[in-house]
Amino acid sequence: MLITNMTHHIAKITELVGSSDKGWQEAAKVALDEATKTIRGITGLEVISKTATVDPNTGNITQYKTTIKVAFGLER
């Protein structure tokens, strides 16, 4: 569940995509770290999808991408 311990009556959901050459978990962390720079009060996240870019010559993954949704309460 995306919204946990919600103290606000209204939550905003924002979708972000992070990327990494290390893995999907690192890509999610990149997205969350960037979100915390401009969004206050993030209460949870949900992983929506995981994708990757593959080098056609080697068959190796060159970039991992994780799409997440973050929830936060609206301030008045």
Model-derived segments and their meaning:
Residues 2-8:
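Alpha-helical assembly-interface signal, strongest on the long, hydrophobic N-terminal helix that forms
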